[in-house]
Amino acid sequence: MKEHINQGDVLKIEHISLPILVTSKDFFNESGEVIGCPINTSPSNSPLHIQVLSDNINGYVHCEKLKLLDLNVRGYKVIGRIPMNDIINITDAIQGIFDYV
């Protein structure tokens, strides 16, 4: 049985070189699909590249590179988790991409 995936988990996904931050909510993730953003180690001045630091995660979440990933057909492993305050900042940045005003 596969692990339950939570918003804020960092995954290593088969055939994807960068770690992926799960940004979708837990109820959505129960489908076996997740929406996530890659975490790159290169610094950037973009307001949509948000730095995250935790025990084993150090990089920049690229909020504009949202991807729908089907974990039912890909191997994956949870390799970390980011703090709630970072999850809030990242989901706010993503929501800001779609705001009307």
Q: Which residues fall in each region the model found?
A:
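Conserved functional hotspots at enzyme active or ligand-binding sites that engage polyanionic ligands
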Residues: 1-101
